[in-house]
Amino acid sequence: MEAPRSVGGRIQRKPLADCTNTVSRSSQQSSSSVKFANPSLTSSLKRLVEQTTLKEKPKDVNTSATAPEIASRPITTDVRPVTRRMSADLASPASAPSRPQTSRSDMGVSDKDFTEPWSVYTVRRKASGQKRSKDASSSTSAAARIRLDLSSSSGKKTRQASENKKKTLKVAPKKRQRTVKQEKEDPVSAACQDYIEKQKAYFAEIDAFELPVEEVSNSDSD
C-alpha cells in the first residue's frame, strides 16, 4: 500500500477502511492476558504453591522410609491462565499469607529434647541441697573441734597446775642449825674504846678535885 501523500506539507490521514495497523481479536485477548499479568501476582502464586507443598510433607522428617517416597512423588501444580476477572480481583494489594505454624515434630525436634532442662534443674537443686548438707556438717565438725580444743586446753591447764604444786614429803625436813658468827675485833673499834675510857677517868678526877675555901675574919675586914 502506498504511503499517504502530503499536501501542502501536511500528512494526510489514513482512511477509516484501512485496517493495516489494527490487530486481530485473538491477538488482543492474548495481549490483554499478558498485559494484566503482574509479576507480583506470579510471585504470590508461587508462594501459595510452596506453602501447599510444605503442608503436604510428612511430620517425621527423620524417618528413612518416607524420604524416598517424597522425593519420587512429582509435584504437579496446575496454573490456570489469568483472566480479566482474576486480574481485577488480584489487582488489589494481596494480603500477606499467614505463615504456617510449624510444630516441634515438623522441625525434627521431639518433646524429649525440651524436657532436658527440667532434669538439669532438678539436678542443680539436688546439688545445692548436697552443698547445704556439706556446709552444715562442716560447721558442726568445726564446732566439735573447737569444743575439743577448749576441753583439751582446760585439761592441759589443770595438769600443769597440778604439776606445779609442791608435792607433800612423807619424811619431815631436817631443821637447819643456826651458826653464830664470831665477831672479829676491829682495831678501830678497840682504839675508840680506849679513848672513851681515858676521857671518863679524866673527868672523874676533875669532879673529885675540891678547892680550899678561905674564911675571912672581922679583923681583916677592918
UniProtKB/Swiss-Prot annotation:
Q: Name one GO biological process term.
A: microsporogenesis
Q: Where is the composition biased (Basic and acidic residues)?
A: 47-60
Segments for region (C-terminal Sororin domain): 192-214
A Gene Ontology term for the protein's cellular component:
nucleus
Q: Where is the composition biased (Low complexity)?
A: 24-33, 88-105
User: Where is motif Nuclear localization signal found?
Assistant: 155-162
Null phenotype?
Answer: Dwarf plants with tissue specific cohesion defects and chromosome mis-segregation associated with sterility (abnormal anthers containing reduced level of viable pollen, and no viable seeds formation in short siliques) as well as premature separation of sister chromatids at anaphase I. Severe alteration of root development with lost characteristic layered cellular organization. Somatic deficiencies, but barely meiotic deficiencies, are alleviated by additional WAPL disruption in the wapl1-1 wapl2 double mutant.
Q: Where in the cell is it found?
A: Nucleus
Query: Which stretches does the entry tag as region Disordered?
Result: 1-189
Name the major location.
nucleus
The family line of this record is: Belongs to the sororin family.
Q: Give the free-text miscellaneous remark of the entry.
A: Named sororin after the Latin word 'soror', which means 'sister', because of its critical role in sister chromatid cohesion.
Q: What does this protein do?
A: Regulator of sister chromatid cohesion in mitosis stabilizing cohesin complex association with chromatin. Antagonizes the action of WAPL proteins (WAPL1 and WAPL2) which stimulates cohesin dissociation from chromatin, particularly during somatic division in root cells and meiocytes during anaphase I. Required for centromeric sister chromatid cohesion during male meiosis (microsporogenesis). Cohesion ensures that chromosome partitioning is accurate in dividing cells and may play an important role in DNA repair.
The protein's name = Sororin-like protein
- Protein source organism: Arabidopsis thaliana (Mouse-ear cress)
